[in-house]
Amino acid sequence: MPKRDAPWRLMAGTSKVSRSANYSPRGSLPKRDAWVNRPMYRKPRIYRSLRGPDVPKGCEGPCKVQSYEQRHDISLVGKVMCISDVTRGNGITHRVGKRFCVKSVYILGKIWMDENIKLKNHTNSVMFWLVRDRRPYGTPMDFGQVFNMFDNEPSTATVKNDLRDRFQVIHRFHAKVTGGQYASNEQALVRRFWKVNNNVVYNHQEAGKYENHTENALLLYMACTHASNPVYATLKIRIYFYDSITN
């Protein structure tokens, strides 16, 4: 017959709990990862002094910004705009020399239909592609020149095989609007923020134009999926960039 367990008062100092057991509330996380979700003021000093690099490698501050505000008429054949056009100068919106790094891109605005189109029963999806052009030359290539589509459908667009080494899709997204008398959704908000760390190189010209790029131009391609009903996009696109140290 098994003996009864001794009273707890007599077992003081003779704990049966294994010393190797881990009852830490953080589970089996490494100590390095346990501080990730903690506020900066509650982290150890070494984590406060070794913060992540705000400034991209090889660049120097301050962080500069350039905005592109425009209303776009988007159709099935697509549209393109260059969002790395930065003029050379000394301001907070200018580049100092030939080289700079676009750290992030912020796109916000809305997609909408006019009064005549929104009364028709249809659904229209607007698709966006953020593309890096590694070897820009002349003028930006049209949507149909860069992308290969099945049955002229932008939702099936992929970069053509012979252009894959030059054009790289960094991000893509879409938004949808619906017209009609009952289930109408005539506008859709757009808000995207991406880290890209794209190193842009210009030639000796000062003007911020696509034709003055020599490496890594950023292009935004837009197209809608409905053949007969175009839509409008009122967008504000901001790029945040740093000048290169080697300028």
UniProtKB/Swiss-Prot annotation:
Q: Where is the protein situated, by its record's location annotation?
A: Virion; Host nucleus
**UniProt-listed Pfam families:** Gemini_coat (PF00844)
The UniProt entry annotates the motif Nuclear localization signal at 31-45
List GO molecular-function terms, semicolon-separated.
DNA binding; structural molecule activity; zinc ion binding
Residue numbers of motif Nuclear export signal?
92-113
Membrane-spanning residues: none
Q: Where is this motif: Bipartite nuclear localization signal?
A: 3-20, 191-238
- Chief site of localization: virion
Q: Give me any GO biological process, just one.
A: viral penetration into host nucleus
- InterPro entries for this protein: Gem_coat_AR1, GV_A/BR1_coat, Viral_coat
Q: Does the keyword DNA-binding apply?
A: yes
Q: Which UniProt keywords apply?
A: Capsid protein, DNA-binding, Host nucleus, Host-virus interaction, Metal-binding, T=1 icosahedral capsid protein, Viral penetration into host nucleus, Virion, Virus entry into host cell, Zinc, Zinc-finger
GO CC annotation: host cell; host cell nucleus; T=1 icosahedral viral capsid
Family membership: Belongs to the geminiviridae capsid protein family.
Q: What does this protein do?
A: Encapsidates the viral DNA into characteristic twinned ('geminate') particles. Binds the genomic viral ssDNA and shuttles it into and out of the cell nucleus. The CP of bipartite geminiviruses is not required for cell-to-cell or systemic movement.
Oligomeric and partner information: Homomultimer. Binds to single-stranded and double-stranded viral DNA. Interacts (via nuclear localization signals) with host importin alpha-1a.
Query: What's the protein called, per UniProt?
Result: Capsid protein
Q: What is the lineage of its organism?
A: Viruses, Monodnaviria, Shotokuvirae, Cressdnaviricota, Repensiviricetes
